[in-house]
């Protein structure tokens, strides 16, 4: 039976370190500040935003929320972003996605100062990540890497298979694994013989958004499985992208869903905000 990599416990440890870093900065007269912008009334987005607000409060990070109506124009949103870019009390800006259809998401993300882009989505930060010199790392992949480190998983020379090529998780986590000297295969919907590719992996990172798509018997004996997926099945059941029951019989270590990667995402957002405030002081 696999060792369960407990995301809640790892997140709690990192958050305690963040809170201590925040107190240290406050002793020097600086409180890290995060601005969260929510456009419209998407229920899931509202839940995420309130979770982020609570996490900030717990860590001692100053957080301000800007709630805009669903009919807000692109120009109005861009004007707010510009205001936040120039606000010295704000070290991180997060625009909650998805945005309403009248707003060009790329244009908004590119308007955020790369030095306040705590989500790590600005092309400048994507480029820095790709050459191994990141300023901000995207929160979920960053969380995955911290979990692997905390679980004592050495990536150097290992075969890592990433399933899913999104800009939010798949591509950045593949680049981060490369930076740790792993041999990385990035799979997607057009990959041939996916089960055979996954069976080669020492580490499987699943981020495809399809419930239990990766079957337990695809997992090599002793592999490490990081399941980024979170899918609702029926009314109440949450499952990952990996068939947990079967995979946990073969893997040496595995993340559960829920309680695995999920808690790490907001934790790394706090970490990025703290790092941004520290960087601001050094300048």
UniProtKB/Swiss-Prot annotation:
Reaction catalysis annotation: (6R)-5,10-methylene-5,6,7,8-tetrahydrofolate + NADP(+) = (6R)-5,10-methenyltetrahydrofolate + NADPH; (6R)-5,10-methenyltetrahydrofolate + H2O = (6R)-10-formyltetrahydrofolate + H(+)
Family annotation (CDD domains): NAD_bind_m-THF_DH_Cyclohyd
Known EC number: 1.5.1.5, 3.5.4.9
Keywords on record: Amino-acid biosynthesis, Histidine biosynthesis, Hydrolase, Methionine biosynthesis, Multifunctional enzyme, NADP, One-carbon metabolism, Oxidoreductase, Purine biosynthesis
Superkingdom in the source lineage: Bacteria
GO cellular component: cytosol
Primary role: Catalyzes the oxidation of 5,10-methylenetetrahydrofolate to 5,10-methenyltetrahydrofolate and then the hydrolysis of 5,10-methenyltetrahydrofolate to 10-formyltetrahydrofolate.
Summary of subunit composition and partner proteins: Homodimer.
Protein name: Bifunctional protein FolD
Origin organism lineage: Bacteria, Pseudomonadati, Thermodesulfobacteriota, Desulfuromonadia, Desulfuromonadales
